A protein has these predicted regions:
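C-terminal membrane-solvent junction of multi-pass transporters and transport-like membrane proteins
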Residues: 16, 189-191, 402-405, 448-499, ...
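Membrane-helix boundary/coupling elements in multi-pass transport proteins
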Residues: 106-124, 278-296, 357-396, 437-455
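Membrane-interface loop-to-helix entry segments
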Residues: 191-251, 307-311, 437-449, 475, ...
Length: 572
């Protein structure tokens, strides 16, 4: 048995991450998570209607309950980076070599698209500022003049607005170097793509300095962004701008993206589960704060504090911002195109606090910073997941390379290249954007299922290992129950975003099998690195002892059954 002791800052060995931060540093690196609410706030309103605010509140509460399991298992591994996926993978290793790497892979699949999705939205904000689309109304002088022209006799104001908007739209907004389709999605090398590439390279250069430099930069940006988000969540309540009628009737929509109220029937519940499914991608994401355990000066103290304080921040912001958005904008406003695709969120936030002119410009700039913060959080977390997966023998060896600053640069380059491909898809249209988001979230739900159940598996197989912090057993049990609830969300709700999302997500998750086989059987000769189980005081031969018996296998079968049954029962 290996005792877990307090680890102070020491000189790192060559090729290792550096112990340079405390829980506050991880908190600020994870402070980009609240900005993820802005990725899909309109999309969830479009699928759930007047209950959208409740979807967000419920989802973040579920995430907070689940975090107790993650905090406990993270304490078992003070020398590992990469987050809950890495810690949970070790629990499943006794029962299957192939299930364990699935945890690491699916967590990476969930986190890495934040780079491309965030860059596409931020690029859209920048493009709108540099080359805005003109706005006209029925009483605009240009519209009146267009209708008065004899050549337009019999035309309507709608025709006039469409024609004038098309004529006044800058050519750069329609320009693309190349475009096409890839199965159910499109791709485009347009202006949004190229601006997004620049933003991605900026984030890469900041991350290249190592975790301490990243945490310091994100602390500054985090304060700039979090405070305005709190203002947006509080000011409309204090100034009486909330229209309480915007929360009723408390029923789902009849059909997605239609303002017609529906009923609590199968179709209605399907849309609700679709909202819960996609909200989980944002609301559970503060677990990334424990990706940095091997970079904590004192992992025994810092790990649990990092995830719980990050969770409380998300609880506040994920409750306030959707609540005030809906209360001020109403369902019609939330279903507006610029809100659904994210490009008009900054302008809406400025109006909510009574801003205009320069205030609107400042709010849009803050929105760009919020997205950059989320992108930095994603690159920091996902690259460390790849790094630790490589160190532990799950993923190819090259991913374990770090630079002199202690940054996992090989993993970061992999993130960058993969997301350039995703960015071309996300920049094409909203349908392609939400397809990436839904497929990514299938990976996240699979990761979530495996790691919530890893809590009780570790209790059975590694109960003798001292834990720096031990969660109340009721939270371990609750986490197990919620793993099946989340599986139901995926089975029932993924189809809401794209008919192929669930199956594409399963295929994406299965890609780890050839990757793992290459590393394990080709590069490592069928053996795991000796240090992989050091924290648990085990050797590879000890993995044959399976105290949980068939329970983990029954859990997997039950999880698959829940997904398939939910997919069959709940239809639109």
């Amino acid at each position: 048995m290996t005792s877990i002791s307090t680890t102070h800052a020491v000189a790192p060995q060559q090729g290792e991450l550096h112990r340079t931060i405390n829980w506050q540093g991880a908190f600020w690196v994870a402070s980009g998570v609240p900005a993820l609410v802005l990725f899909s706030i309109g999309g969830i309103a479009g699928t759930t209607g007047n209950i959208a605010f409740a979807i967000w509140m419920t989802s973040v509460v579920l995430g907070l309950i689940q975090s107790f399991t993650y905090a406990e298992i993270a304490g078992l591994f003070p020398s590992k980076s990469g987050g809950a996926s890495v810690y949970g993978a070790t629990a499943w290793l006794r029962y299957s070599k192939f299930i364990a790497p699935l945890s690491v892979w699916c967590n990476w699949l969930a986190w890495t698209p934040v780079l491309s999705l965030g860059c596409s939205i931020a690029a859209a904000y920048i493009l709108s500022a540099l080359a805005p689309i003109p706005a006209f109304s029925e009483i605009s002088p240009e519209v009146v003049a267009w209708l008065a022209d004899p050549a337009n006799l019999g035309k309507t104001a709608t025709d006039a607005i469409a024609a004038l908007t098309a004529a006044g739209t800058p050519a750069i907004r329609d320009w693309t170097l190349y475009s096409g389709t890839l199965g159910p999605v499109s791709f485009s090398l347009n202006a949004i793509f190229w601006i997004g590439v620049i933003l991605m390279l900026i984030v890469f250069s900041i991350q290249h300095r190592g975790i301490l430099g990243t945490a310091n930069v994100q602390k500054i940006i985090g304060l700039i962004v979090i405070i305005p988000m709190l203002i947006v969540g509080i000011v409309p309540i204090l100034t009486g701008q909330i229209n309480w009628d915007n929360y009723s009737p408390f029923v789902p929509l009849a059909t997605a993206y239609s303002a017609e109220p529906g009923e609590w029937n199968i179709a209605g519940w399907t849309l609700v589960f679709g909202g819960m499914f996609i909200a989980a991608w944002s609301a559970y994401a503060f677990e990334t704060s424990i990706c940095f355990t091997s970079e904590f000066k004192n992992p025994q103290r810092d790990t649990v504090r990092a995830i719980l304080y990050s969770g409380l921040l998300c609880l506040v912001l994920y409750s306030l911002v959707p609540f005030t958005f809906q209360g001020v904008l109403g369902l019609e406003g939330m279903l507006a195109g610029p809100i659904v695709d994210g490009s008009g969120v900054g302008h809406a936030m400025a109006q909510m606090v009574g801003g205009a002119g320069i205030v609107t410009s400042i709010m849009i700039m803050l929105m760009i910073l919020a997205l950059m913060l989320a992108i930095m959080t994603a690159m920091a977390g996902s690259s460390r997941t790849l790094y630790q997966g490589s160190v532990d023998g799950w993923l190819p060896k090259y991913l374990s390379r770090v630079n002199p600053h202690g940054a996992p640069t090989a993993a970061m380059w992999t993130d960058l290249v993969f997301n350039l491909f995703l960015l071309a898809i996300a920049a094409a249209d909203a349908t392609s954007y939400f397809f990436i988001l839904a497929v990514s979230n299938c990976g996240y739900i699979i990761f979530n299922f495996l790691n919530l159940n890893a809590g009780w598996i570790h209790r059975i197989d590694n109960g003798h290992i001292r834990r720096p912090w031990k969660a109340p057993t009721i939270f371990i049990a609750a986490g197990c129950f919620l793993s099946f609830v989340n599986a139901m969300f995926m089975g029932a709700g993924a189809k809401v975003w794209n008919p192929w999302a669930l199956w594409a997500g399963v295929i994406a998750a299965a890609l780890i099998i050839p990757v793992f086989c290459y590393r394990h059987y080709v590069q490592d000769g069928g053996k795991f690195p000796p240090h992989m189980l050091d924290d648990l005081g085990l050797k590879e031969g000890d993995l044959a002892v399976r105290k949980a018996g068939i329970l983990p296998y029954l859990t997997l079968v039950a999880g698959v059954a829940v997904v398939l049954i939910a997919n069959w029962i709940f239809v639109i």
